Amino acid sequence: MGQGKTPFIKEHAFTIMKPETISQNLTHPRPYINNPRITAQTAKGQEVAAAETDDDENDGNPTVLPTQFLRSITPIFLIRHPALIFESILRVSGPTMGAHVDDEEFPVEASLRWLRVLYDWFAKSTVNGVRPIVLNADEIMAHPKIVQQLCEQLQLDPTGVRFEWNPVPPSIIEGQSSYQQHFFSTIQSSCGVRLDKHSAAQGQELDLDAMTTTWQEVYGLETTATLRSFVDAAMPDYEYLCHYELRL
């Protein structure tokens, strides 16, 4: 941290998991060659002692990142209903990258297991009383004050939080690639928090069966059946993490 700034790092959990971790948590384990490891360095650019890096192998660290680094951060987990996450993968990545439920990597992306595995590791590896924080996208949309509460908890200035903004001008969007236009269409056209993206947007709990029927019309029976199976499999992990989410 320098000049009063706090570094913020955002990444999908599965992208930092060890291949071994992924293989062990898939219904059908996959072979892997080795576990890559990112080595921590001192401020002078020298590698830390081997004994310190060996801790990564002995403490159950499920990621390729050094335990020393993970213990220096405040972990924040953002969760959302699996039905909304997994369908969005097809809706957004399908047209832009050809994503399909039968892709080899889809079972890895369409899972909340990596969040749960990493949450549990952080919870057991608490240092100086720092506990992992869980934010539910639904709660953030319905109760924006949760973000202000988070800022206070992290000792950040809550007045810097924005709930409204100007849409991206069409002139800028026109200069973007088709991928960017499609992938960022929602956020770029918005002017604030979109409550219609809430899982209970109509004031009712998410009706998964009704949503499945809609999917059938868009993606067909076979793809929908596979998509629904991923959602059902992820629900226990989602409900587990919901138990720890930050609330007002």
Predicted regions and their residues:
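PAPS-dependent sulfotransferases, especially Golgi type II membrane carbohydrate sulfotransferases
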Residues: 157-248
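Small/polar (Gly/Ser/Thr/Ala-rich) solvent-exposed segments
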Residues: 1-15
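PAPS-dependent sulfotransferase catalytic domain
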Residues: 13-161, 181
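Generic structural motif recognizing short loop/turn segments at the entrances and edges of beta-strands
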Residues: 4-5, 130-131, 191
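Hydrophobic, Leu/Ile/Phe/Ala-enriched alpha-helical segments that form helix-helix packing faces
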Residues: 1, 89, 119-126, 154, ...
